[in-house]
From Swiss-Prot:
Occurrences of domain GH18 (ranges): 22-383
Lineage: Eukaryota, Metazoa, Chordata, Craniata, Vertebrata
Protein family according to the UniProt entry: Belongs to the glycosyl hydrolase 18 family.
Name listed for the protein in its UniProt record: Chitinase-3-like protein 1
Glycan attachment residues as annotated in the record: N60, N367
Originating species: Bos taurus (Bovine)
Amino acid sequence: MGLRAAHTGFVVLVLLQSCAAYKLICYYTSWSQYREGDGSCFPDAIDPFLCTHVIYSFANISNNEIDTWEWNDVTLYDTLNTLKNRNPNLKTLLSVGGWNFGSQRFSKIASKTQSRRTFIKSVPPFLRTHGFDGLDLAWLYPGWRDKRHLTTLVKEMKAEFVREAQAGTEQLLLSAAVPAGKIAIDRGYDIAQISRHLDFISLLTYDFHGAWRQTVGHHSPLFRGQEDASSDRFSNADYAVSYMLRLGAPANKLVMGIPTFGRSYTLASSKTDVGAPISGPGIPGQFTKEKGILAYYEICDFLHGATTHRFRDQQVPYATKGNQWVAYDDQESVKNKARYLKNRQLAGAMVWALDLDDFRGTFCGQNLTFPLTSAIKDVLARV
């Protein structure tokens, strides 16, 4: 009896360890609060047991010091970090930068010793004051000249976190978001060097295709399509992951991005297959109100009366209705991606973003909140 109980306990321990082995990094965007009606999302909508890490996007930098961006950021910080009262194992990070921040602003700060030092010194007290467990650097698309400055910034930030933790507090986490395009990686990131100082890297394995290409195509294919032109051979998650590993990113620090949004296009003709011409981005969603992009919960609405298809080679779906063509991820495709990253022995998955998933559970007809993120979690939790 004692042996059986001990064995059962061991099995339970192994299961818990295997579940904890994979990270599920989930971004929340502060501007989602401004969406109308059921599209409005606040941090208290987040299930505290869904993700291992939640990253709040974005913080600003003012006078070379980390700062809030939204008028009510401090309130939302508190709401988010209160989730840890229900799940003490949840880690929260604050992401600084983002697409709208501008690479030049980062460059200006990182390239000068004094401004870089001022920024770095401002981070730990800010994170501690507001209850965060770490910082996520979202310096997107640095240039050739920025590469060594980014490396120095990461190295010195990590050193500051180590120094600050000597007072007896748990060391702050440091992560970075890195675009998945080969050209962007080559131009701005010394992957081997920054990997040494980061706790994990979120690889943005989406936005491989958009309306700027003048034709339809999927923004987040897992694999290269059979009909892809040679110029598109790098534009898939499999290539990006393999390339990052080849450059020296340790698999146990690499997190693969999975989008909960779709890319939409307005067709220019009756053609709907790969390479069909477009006249521009798709019409804005009811809640996100941005041309060419739809939240998953808006896609669920779009699918009523639409014709759905699946790229078998790329392992991702798309749908057509009238002159609208929408590439997206569904539960099947995100599960395939989660299985893939497990096979590659990566650190886990990243989701952009919780507020673009069906966070209310009312749009997609399953009576399930966060259906895409939950599907990823289910696969990661399996032994």
